[in-house]
Curated annotation (Swiss-Prot):
Function as written in the Swiss-Prot or TrEMBL entry: Probably part of an ABC transporter complex. Responsible for energy coupling to the transport system.
Annotated ABC transporter domain residues: 6-242
GO molecular function: ATP binding; ATP hydrolysis activity; ATPase-coupled transmembrane transporter activity
Swiss-Prot/TrEMBL keywords: ATP-binding, Cell membrane, Membrane, Nucleotide-binding, Translocase, Transport
Protein name stated in the entry: Putative ABC transporter ATP-binding protein CPE0195
Membrane topology listed for this record: Peripheral membrane protein
Length: 285
């Protein structure tokens, strides 16, 4: 039996101006895995995330966290936000304290933990995100990538079960993208945290994500593992997305250059293995 940490049932959300942002969303998020939410701008990804941790309340339908409907009382929402943390796309919207230590400790202080526990959690969060050396640095002196790590540490300090990140790789150079994604996967594997990301960086999805949901106009139109989702090439392109670059290359080799592949590979490692297998078969024949 599958273990789902979040279950979304017929979720609808309407903004006060009448915008119907989410339309009958049904979604199950597996515990302890990395899930990607894909879709163009304005499809409802951020609205969905804000429903996940109680910033917004569904117009209809419901969300279950740990198999229990979300409790929208003040106490229930405070508890929920300790368990489901959000890291926004722009860390400047999340950092507001004078120093890194003050900012990272904010959530733990609000939980009314003891000073010793706060210090312990902050030190652990700083170590986990590899920013111990920035502990006393003013937040306004940080690079964009450093600010991203501080924002993640500020959520980690509350020891959440779910970490939601809106465009975690936006604004980062290639090395920064690789480092931040490896950090997230490390936390998922070592701490058992469920990671949910919204991203336009298609190439990271087959490398780091276990499950994928594709949204269009407030609805989920595709779901599955990366190979299952990107196999639906026409649907992917109709919603203004694309295949991962390696997947596109393998598609071209098959359709235009006579290569014979059983399935669409999406990563360099997968493609190398398939091409070597094809090459060996040709030479042996």
């Amino acid at each position: 039996m599958e273990d789902y940490i979040l279950k979304v049932e017929e979720l609808n959300y309407n903004y006060s101006d009448g915008t119907h942002a989410l339309k009958g969303i049904n979604m199950n998020i597996k515990r302890g895995e990395v899930t990607a939410i894909l879709g163009g701008n304005g499809v409802g990804k951020s609205t969905l995330f804000q429903n996940f941790n109680g910033i917004l309340k569904p117009s209809s339908g419901r969300i279950l966290f740990d198999n229990k409907p979300i409790d929208y009382s003040r106490k229930g929402i405070m508890k929920l936000r300790e368990s489901i943390g959000i890291v926004f796309q722009d860390p400047d919207n999340q950092l507001f304290s004078a120093s890194v230590y003050q900012d990272v400790s904010f959530g733990a202080v609000n939980m009314k933990l003891s000073e010793d526990e706060i210090r312990k959690r902050v030190d652990n969060a700083l170590k986990r995100t590899s920013i111990e050396h920035l502990k006393n640095k003013p937040t306004h002196c940080l690079s964009f990538g450093q600010k991203k790590r501080v924002a993640i540490a500020g959520v980690l300090v509350m020891e959440p079960k779910v970490l939601i990140l809106d465009e975690p790789t936006a604004g980062l150079d290639p090395m920064g993208v690789s480092e931040i994604m490896k950090l997230l996967v490390e936390m998922q594997k070592e701490l058992g945290i469920t990671i949910i990301i919204a991203t336009h960086d298609i190439d990271i999805v087959p490398l780091y994500c276990d499950n994928v949901f594709v949204m269009k106009e407030g609805r989920v139109i595709l779901q599955g593992n990366p190979k299952e989702v990107f196999a639906e090439k026409e649907v992917i392109r109709k919603v203004n997305l694309r295949l991962p670059r390696i997947g596109h290359l393998m598609e071209i080799l098959k359709e235009k250059d006579g290569f014979v592949f059983d399935e669409l590979d999406l990563t360099i490692g997968q493609a190398r293995k398939t091409i070597n297998s094809w090459k060996n078969k040709i030479f042996n024949d």
